[in-house]
């Protein structure tokens, strides 16, 4: 008799199961906390001068932009816009209940 050849089973298309069992529990990620901005509540002279000189040169002026660039709080930014409007250095583009948009006043 001829020696028997060891039959190798044909490779299966399914991947071999890697020990099922319990999977690791997903850990809760700690929520990202927003950094608190410490904006000014009242104008000091330097910030007020900066407002009068720089703000009318901005192409787009909103309370949030003034608040961000001058480090003043929102209510102060709205007051500042009202004052710049009264002086005629900026003009309104659009007013919505939640967002007011202004731009520099073009003379012409």
Curated annotation (Swiss-Prot):
**Which stretches are tagged as biased composition: Basic residues?**
22-31
Coiled coil: which residue ranges? none
Does the record bear Metal-binding in its keywords? no
Which terms are listed as keywords in the entry? Ribonucleoprotein, Ribosomal protein
Q: Which GO terms describe its molecular function?
A: structural constituent of ribosome
Q: Which domain of life is it from?
A: Eukaryota
Offer a single GO CC term for the protein.
Answer: cytosolic small ribosomal subunit
Region Disordered, as annotated, extends over: 1-36
Concerning InterPro entries, the annotation shows: Ribosomal_eS25 (IPR004977)
According to the UniProt entry, where is the signal peptide?
A: none
Q: Which family does it belong to?
A: Belongs to the eukaryotic ribosomal protein eS25 family.
Q: What is this protein called?
A: Small ribosomal subunit protein eS25x
Recorded source organism is Arabidopsis thaliana
């Amino acid at each position: 008799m001829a020696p028997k050849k060891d039959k190798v089973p044909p490779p299966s298309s399914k991947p071999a199961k890697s020990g099922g069992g319990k999977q690791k529990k997903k850990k809760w990620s700690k929520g990202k906390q927003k950094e608190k901005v410490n904006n000014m509540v009242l104008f000091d002279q330097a910030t007020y001068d900066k407002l009068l000189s720089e703000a009318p040169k901005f192409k787009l002026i909103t309370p949030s932009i003034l608040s961000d660039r001058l480090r003043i709080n929102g209510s102060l930014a709205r007051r500042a816009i009202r004052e710049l409007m009264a002086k005629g250095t900026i003009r309104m583009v659009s007013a919505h209940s939640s967002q007011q948009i202004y731009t520099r006043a073009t003379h012409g």
